[in-house]
Amino acid sequence: MKILHIVKTATGATWVYHQVRVLRSLGFEIVVALPSATAGLAPKYQEAGAAVVPINLDVPTRHPWQIPAVLKSCRTLVQTVRPDIIHTHHVGTTLVVRAALGKSSPIPRVFQVPGTLHLEHPFFAHLDTSLAGPRDHWIAACRWTQRKYHQLGVSPQRVSLSYLGTDLSAFTPTRRNVLRRELGLMPDTPLVGMVCYMYAPKRFLGQTAGLKGHEDFIAAFPIAKKKLPNLHGVMIGGAWNGAIQYENHLRELGHRHCNGYLTFAATRSDIPDVYPDLDLAVVPSHTENIPFAAIEALLSGVPVVTTNVGGIPDLVQEGVSGRLVPPRNPQAIADAIVTSLQNRVEAHRLTLKGQEIARHLFDVERTTREVAQIYTTLISKAA
């Protein structure tokens, strides 16, 4: 069975690479279309045995006059590859495929929905469902998304649930003090971290702050510091997609409000080695599927404070597997930081439960087999 995966980025969406790697081991023929055949994850796709086609099939929002050419390129790609199934992983590429091929295309199409943002805005949610044809299928990556499609009128038979998987073996709770040495911190200094790219506000959606909640993390720190004088914070991850101005804004905000006890670290590739150095991970998202920042922290044995939005409660349940707080609430974040660090035994108990949930839900070997079964079902229906 030949599957065409269409990805909007070569540098992100690591979950797609892990999925493709396992699909290849299961015997599927995989073609991956993404913007570069040499940058980012492209070589790893090729090492996994997938064919890579360099093509950008995201919606050219800044150059709308290029849309006809993008649609034509999409049709040419599909005619050349002749896939049994087309699997898209982002909203933009999904809309391009549907617009290019139309509702009557005989090829089954799968949209594995990685986030909740477009579904929170009626126009984009309607665009998603209205462009779909009878052979379109959705894979929700959290229960919130699954319920939302049902509310939008999509038949439950056309919406599967399968979480975005990761390589569990990459994460261990062994502390190596890599980060603490870099920061010049003692082993017993309370260290709280936020690990996430900096996504600039989407003004066309009315956002005035970044959707990952960096501003809230910065605002919470001085509040928590009053009760935990030795507290130190670190923000790991730089600007996404060239959002340098936004990164500079966050750095200025941090320097102004946190007076040297919040360190900004660049994007780095050794995240599995860094996580165990944290005493607590904070994931203060405003909108979210289930963030890998929370998944990876729990897999590394690190307690998590996160917000009660989107699919996060599938993983982090208040008082069961972590701490849940309302979004956009620095005071609540600060209170949860203090509670977690002052009650280490309880925080450890919650983390063990969170780790158990994460190891089950996000094991890429298991989730990819679910996707493979979805493929088989769709092909049998199309026959």
Model-identified regions with their sequence ranges:
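Aromatic "clamp/platform" in nucleotide-sugar-dependent glycosyltransferases that forms part
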Residues: 267, 286
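Short His-centered aromatic/hydrophobic patch
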Residues: 88-94, 113
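A short helix/loop element that forms part of the nucleotide-sugar donor recognition site in Leloir-type
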Residues: 73, 172-185, 250
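A conserved, positively charged/aromatic
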Residues: 110-139, 152
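Conserved acidic donor-binding segment of nucleotide-sugar-dependent glycosyltransferases
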Residues: 318-319, 323-330, 339-345
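Short hydrophobic beta-strand element within catalytic cores of glycosyltransferases
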Residues: 303-306, 316
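Short, structured helix-loop element that forms part of the nucleotide-activated donor/catalytic region
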Residues: 42-46, 214, 232-260, 346
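A short, well-ordered alpha-helix in the C-terminal region of glycosyltransferases
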Residues: 332, 339, 346-361, 370-373
